[in-house]
Every structure is written in C-alpha cells, then in structure tokens.
Amino acid sequence: MQTRLGEKDINLPQYYNNRELSWLDFNYRVLQESYDKNNPLLEKLNFISIFSSNLDEFFMVRVAGLKDQVKMGYDKPENKAQMTPQEQLDAIKIKNTDYVNTQYQRYNELIKELANYDIEMVKPEDLSDALIEKLEQEFKLSVLPTLTPLGIDAYHPFPKLNNKSLNIFVDIDTEDAINSAIVQIPSLIPRFLTLNEGTKQYVVMVEDVITYFINYLFTGYEVLNTFTFRITRNADLTIHEDGAEDLLIEIERFLKERKSGSAVRLELDCRTSEKENVEWLINQLEIEDNDIYYLDGPLDLTFLFGLVDHLSHKLKYLTYEKYTPQPPRSLGNKNIYQLSLERDIFFHHPYESFEPIVDFIRQAADDPNTIAIKQTLYRVSKDSPIINSLKEAAENGKQVTVLVELKARFDEENNVHWARMLEDAGCHVIYGMTHLKTHSKIALVVKRINNELTSFVHLGTGNYNDKTAKLYTDMGIITTNKDIAEDAINFFNYLSGYSTKPEYNKLIVAPYDIRDVFIDRIDKEIRSHLQHGNGKIMMKMNSLTDKTIIEKLFEASQAGVKIQLIIRGICCLKPGIPGISENIEVVSIVGRLLEHSRIYYFHNNSEAHIYLSSADVMTRNMIKRVEILFPVEDKSIGQRLVNYMNLQLSDNQKGRYQDAQGLYHYVENNSSPLNSQSYLMQEAIKYGEELKKQSVQPSGQPVHSRRGGSWMRKLKNTFKR
C-alpha cells in the first residue's frame, strides 16, 4: 500500500536518490577539493588520496553486499529510488568510472605541478645511470629480501592474494614452457623510493622498481611480460554472534576470514596489453567486466598520504597553516569538575581542544574521591590516553566499566587489543550487545563529594579518539543534571545485560525511541506551523537514508514548514520538488575538516527543542545501533548551535546545494566569501589569545575578515555565548 500525502504519491522513485549513488556523489565532492584554488598543493593531493581510501571501503562493503544479493538471486528493488541490486551495480560502474577517470586526470595534473618544486615522479628508465645504480643498491638492500615469487602451475595453484594487495603478474620463458608467476608486494615496505640529485628529488613507485629489476627474482630465465594489478575483496562478512561462546574469539576468526573474501574489484594500469593473461586472471578471481577498472597512473593512490607526509617537511608552505585547537569557550581556565557543578559545559571540537575530555577521565582516574567510571568506546586511537587513564583508574581501585564495541567496522582488531588490555588491568569490559552496534558516546564519572555521590556525565556526537578529534567536527556536553545522571546509570545497567529497556527521564535511545521522537517532533512542528505560521526544522548530520523520516519531512514540507538540512554525505531525499519537497533545502559542506556533528532543531513556535546525537538519520542508526539523542536545555548553548547551523547554511565557499534532480552545485558568490570552518578557527584563536591576557572569560568578538563584508558584520557577536 502506497503512502499518499495530499494528492501526491511520495513513493515515486524520482523523489529519492539511491543510497549508493548518493555516496559516490559525496566522494566526488571530496575530489572537488583537489580543484579548489584556495587549497595548497599538497592538501589537494591529500584529497585525491582520501577519495581512493573512501572508495576502497565502499567496494569492500557496499559493492560487496550488492554482489552477494545478485549471487543469491535477490532482485527486489530498494525502497526509495527502487533500483534492483544489479541495476545499482550497473549504475555504480558508470558513475564511478567517470569519477575515477577524473581523479586520475587531476592526479596527473597535480604531479606535473610538483615538478615546479623540484619533485618529479619518474620511472626507473628515466633516471641517469648514476641514479639507477643507487636505485639498484636500494632495491637489493630494502626491497628484494622481502619478495617471494609465487609460481602458478599444476603444483602451485592460484595463490590467495590479500585484500587491497598490489601484485605483479610475470610471464617467464623456462625453455621447456612459458610459465607464470605472481609477485605480491608486501604492504609493510615503502610504496615509493626517493633519490636526490642536485636540487631535484625523484620519486619512483616501488612496483616500477621491482618490475625494472625483476630478473633478480628469476635468475636464469627470460622474463617476457609483466603487469601490475590490485585486488579488492569482500570485507562485509557475517559475524556469527548467536552461537559464539566468546565474541572475542569469534571476531578474531572473522578478521582472518575477511582477508580472503571474494574479489569485488580488479584494478589494472590502462597501458596493460597482456589481454590473454588478464582474461586468465579474471577467470581465477571469478569477477565480471563491471568489476574491472583500468587506471591512468599508479594503482592505489592512497600512497599520496605517505608522499605528502614525506614532502611536507621540505614544502611546509604547500600545506594548510597549522591550527592548534583552542581552550573551550564554555570552560576557559576553570576546573572542569568544579564548573560542571554550576552549569553545563559545551565543547566544539576541533575548534576547541579535545584535551579537556581526556583530562575529564584522567582526573577521575587520579582522584581518590572517584568511586566509578563507566564509558562506551567505539573507535579510539592506537595509543589512546583515555585507555591509559581507564587502566590506571582500575589499578587505583576504582570501579571501571567499559563497553568496547568489537564490531566497529575496520577497528575490530584494534578494539580486541584494547578489550584484552583493559580486562588485564581489572576493568569490567562489555563487548557490545548481540545483533546491535553500540555507537553511543557517553562517559559517567561518579564521585563522593561532601559524603554524597555526585554523577558527572559527558555526552557527545563523536568518538573518544584524540587523533580524529583534531580533524572531525564534533560536539559534546558535560553535565551534572540529576535526571541525565540517573539516565546514564540506567543506560549502563542496560548495556551490561542486567536490565530490561529502561524508562529514561531525558535521554532518548535507539533502537527503540529516536525515530519515534523525530516523528513526534515533526508532527508537532506541522501543527505549530498550521497554527502560528512559523514552523522550522534544521538538521545537521552525516547522512539521511531513513525512508520513514524522509516521508515525514515531505509531509512537513507540504504543510509549509521550512526545512534546512546540512548533510555532508548520503542524502536520499531530493529537495525543491514542487508539491513534495519545495520547502526543503539541502546543503553539503566538504572542506578541511570532516563534518561529523549531529544537531536536530525544532522551532516549536520559539520554544525550541534542540538535540545533539551520536546518530545520523539512517535506518541502521534507528534500528540496528544503540544510539543516544540528548536534549540541549541550556539556552546559551542552544543559541550557539542555532548560530552555528545558520553560519554553515551561509557558507559560500565550501557549501554545495542539492537541486531537485539530486545534483550538487557550489553556492553562487554574491556576497563576501565565507568559509564556515575557517571562520570558526579564527574565532577560536581570538578567544584563546584573549584568554591568555585576562583571567575572566572574554566576550569573544568575531575576527573580522581582511576582506570585510556584510556577512562578517552580521555575524558579529554570533558566537560570544
């Protein structure tokens, strides 16, 4: 039965973007940053690398899942754009081929620009005899000992090649016959070698070096042909939770299995001419034409991360000017625990430092008045100071409970390591919940103050990861609100498995309630608008895929409610369609920092309801994850959030608006340039400088652009709260 609002059928596929194609469009917006004239050269190369890294995961998970559906004969269309799995795979191939070709065209342009700074990407045959001699020495010393040719014949079947591995196919004349072999390039050796001559530095890809000196591996035989190829495998395998006696052991089994999943993509150099060998390889990998990509340059451009890191020491002026996160405006120089007894404290990372959150746990671990610490961990850094503090707290006799989500994709191995280490230190470790991923960001510290127990709660939109907190925009609040403290205690009891679904005072928790609360809030906004004529909804998130909420937003738009959506990534809703979504606008901001915070605002006739959350409006977040949506009740913090969203909606440098056809366009620059991320960095720096000069919290007037302009005047005082 189709849902109808008014006379419009909102199930028509033309009102929706397909999830996978929308993600590819997001990844293209990442690639667009390599064209931005305001980005330094090395940062442009970084965006090309990010594009490739993103695409690897997309193929390992999303494409792999679609291919599995096709193999099982599943041909039911998805519920929004109504495309079957095979139709999606065909469309992905067309769109992604275009985007990848654009990526390599841009890569080759930027590599030519590098030559202006005496950095040249070359093949070994382009080097002088003296440099080839040096290269040969380096090859024999650092590369050759790591290589093992894998013969392919009756006694040597086709080898199990690792996921994302780079390999060289070799044909050898052994006199008796022409045989083949594969040389897998170890992932732990450098991807490129560098050679200096005068003022120039030459960069040579390791696969080109191995190919040039390939005879060292096949002494006595003639090498006839070689070509390089790369395999991507299915990493979207099933973790069997139901029958697992020990989830830790099951995860470790799963990690081994993932390395050799079925092949989902084969990448080849477009100059590869060995058609017969390529056909043989395709048959061995059991892939189809749709899975093959011919590339005009080195395979796997994620090597640019390492190249940029290598060159940034010499060419620092070709990177972003360093930014140091500043003291939080809500905290200033005050003690985090003392101040939180008086009022809620707001944090906006990475404009404001993540260090106070690290200190929040560190101080609790050291304080003899601390009774208990409870925390959820989804993704943490490899040398996490928070992990160290939790271990120290347990060793100091505190009651420490940590939920480590073992099923956090591509962080499983890291999380297994931390779970074992925390257990060894005496922490009570929860591995997660059956069939659910715990994606919530919450920490609870219980202290004895004046012979009474006081609970301090941190709630956030992003991970407790001190490394990504410098790159991802996220928000958090520390509060001693008694209702939220009680909710936090009940939440952790629920996670531990010793409680049925609690009744919460203020926290809203998925998989049970977040979707229902969103529906209720949208319905109330519709009623308020029909009565007062001022309905407005603003939402900021990473992705929007949940059809139930999209339909409700269509209904609100049809009722006249103004809806502004700031969605960095996937957006399955098409805005601006007359009679359906004409009152909805969608903007995506992709820039220096990765937009990661989730904010939900409902005007409610000037009695606004504002929430922060760990959850995007995706079906998986609504029904397959443990998420927290929490209210922002402090008026000054709420105003900061509203001002922040208005600022982002006014961004005419990094903002792209989606049209009714689902296409994204840069905002037309009809006013003074405004980059919301740069603006907030300037604001934070100014506050940090003022804080050094005075002990009282300053007013935090905005930094004026050198270009001035109306927007800078309008935004004066916007972020002073």
Swiss-Prot record:
Amino-acid positions noted as binding ATP in the UniProt annotation, renumbered to this chain: 54, 472, 568, 596
Residues holding Mg(2+): 379, 409
PTM summary: An intermediate of this reaction is the autophosphorylated ppk in which a phosphate is covalently linked to a histidine residue through a N-P bond.
Top-level class of the enzyme under EC nomenclature: transferase
Annotated ranges, domain PLD phosphodiesterase: 434-468
EC nos: 2.7.4.1
Active-site residue list: 439 (phosphohistidine intermediate)
GO BP: any one term: polyphosphate biosynthetic process
Disordered as annotated region, ranges: 692-721
Keywords: ATP-binding, Kinase, Magnesium, Metal-binding, Nucleotide-binding, Phosphoprotein, Transferase
Required cofactor(s): Mg(2+)
Cellular compartments per GO CC: polyphosphate kinase complex
Pfam entry (one): PP_kinase
SUPFAM superfamilies reported in the protein's UniProt record: Phospholipase D/nuclease, PHP14-like, PPK N-terminal domain-like
Catalytic activity: [phosphate](n) + ATP = [phosphate](n+1) + ADP
GO molecular function: ATP binding; metal ion binding; polyphosphate kinase activity
UniProt cross-references to InterPro entries, sorted A to Z: PP_kinase, PP_kinase_C_1, PP_kinase_middle, PP_kinase_middle_dom_sf, PPK_C_dom2, PPK_N_dom, PPK_N_dom_sf
This protein's record includes keyword Transmembrane helix: no
Keyword Secreted attributed: no
Family: Belongs to the polyphosphate kinase 1 (PPK1) family.
Function: Catalyzes the reversible transfer of the terminal phosphate of ATP to form a long-chain polyphosphate (polyP).
Name of the protein this chain belongs to: Polyphosphate kinase
Gene source species: Staphylococcus epidermidis (strain ATCC 35984 / DSM 28319 / BCRC 17069 / CCUG 31568 / BM 3577 / RP62A)
Name of the gene: ppk
